[in-house]
């Protein structure tokens, strides 16, 4: 349990900015206008499951409160959120969604975990298998790659949104049970044991500290660098196909995406441009 600071970053190192030992390389679904409909569909399913499991009151249902926060971060209208909760609470809600997880391998042994929420497991299994096959990967058995990841609570706080200084913020997090607190150029990262995530989250909320992201996630223990053009094409094909599937909730992998920003790729670019590419996950330079 310790505090790490990474304030000084040379130009040659900027492609690794934010890539701490706890850096999560979860493949996030795009949140542009074209993808909003899919994002809202996914969140709607999560609302339905959260309400079914813990009731419609977010004050007494932490899981639902988390989904609502995620919905608002994705600019989901409040009336859409409320309709989803009301629909999930009604007796006429006959759609039953189930969580399922698939594990497999991408190019050069990259590990991929796919978490889904579906009303038809046969359809979902076929679609996920197709994504791996088209990217020359393979589906494995349960547990074949999950041992390469650690399940952790992860909270990201943007510095521009937080008036509290780093030392005070660190003490609040650690006192509430956080395992680690780190500082990057523009954000703070808090890591927790999954069982302590809710307590740490509540402690930050009590201090009215805005959280840019807060979730229990899968963090790779090690990362795989892909440099061959064929490997890059194949892993992007797998991830793109999974992105297009509404049943897919989250995709975790240990491909070191940031390593693709070699020095010769970013020399001549100003820092703002490099940050834009990194922050927007724009990994199509090859």
Where are these regions (language model features)?
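Short, small-residue-biased leader/transition segments that mark boundaries at the very start
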Residues: 1-2
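N-terminal organelle transit peptides
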Residues: 6-10
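N-terminal cationic and glycine-rich segments that engage phosphates or anionic surfaces
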Residues: 12-140, 145-156, 196, 253
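Positively charged, low-complexity, intrinsically disordered RNA-binding extensions
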Residues: 157-262
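Positively charged N-terminal leader segments that act as targeting/secretion signals
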Residues: 262-282
């Amino acid at each position: 349990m310790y505090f790490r600071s990474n304030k000084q970053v040379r130009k040659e190192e900027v492609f690794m900015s934010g890539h701490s030992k706890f850096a999560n390389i979860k493949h996030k679904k795009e949140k542009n206008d074209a993808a909003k409909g899919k994002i809202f569909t996914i969140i709607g399913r999560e609302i339905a499951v959260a309400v079914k499991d813990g009731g419609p009151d977010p004050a007494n249902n932490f899981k639902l409160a988390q989904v609502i926060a995620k919905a608002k971060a994705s600019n989901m209208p409040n009336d859409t959120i409320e309709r989803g909760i009301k629909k999930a609470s009604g007796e006429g809600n006959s759609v039953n969604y189930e969580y399922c997880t698939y594990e497999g391998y991408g190019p050069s042994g990259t590990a991929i975990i796919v978490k889904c929420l579906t009303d038809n497991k046969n359809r979902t299994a076929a679609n996920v298998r197709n994504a791996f096959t088209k990217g020359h990967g393979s589906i494995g058995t349960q547990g074949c790659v999950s041992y390469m990841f650690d399940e952790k609570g992860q909270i990201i706080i943007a510095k521009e949104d937080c008036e509290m200084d780093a030392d005070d913020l660190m003490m609040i997090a650690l006192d509430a049970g956080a395992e680690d607190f780190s500082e990057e150029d523009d954000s703070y990262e808090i890591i927790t044991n999954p069982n302590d995530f809710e307590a740490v989250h509540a402690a930050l909320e009590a201090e009215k500290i805005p959280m840019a992201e807060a979730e229990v996630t899968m963090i790779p223990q090690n990362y795989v660098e892909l440099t061959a053009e064929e490997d890059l094409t194949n892993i992007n094909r797998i991830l793109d196909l999974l992105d297009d599937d509404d049943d897919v909730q989250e995709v975790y992998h240990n491909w070191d995406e940031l390593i693709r920003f070699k020095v010769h790729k970013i020399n001549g670019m100003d820092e703002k441009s490099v940050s834009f590419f990194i922050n927007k996950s724009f990994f199509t330079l090859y």
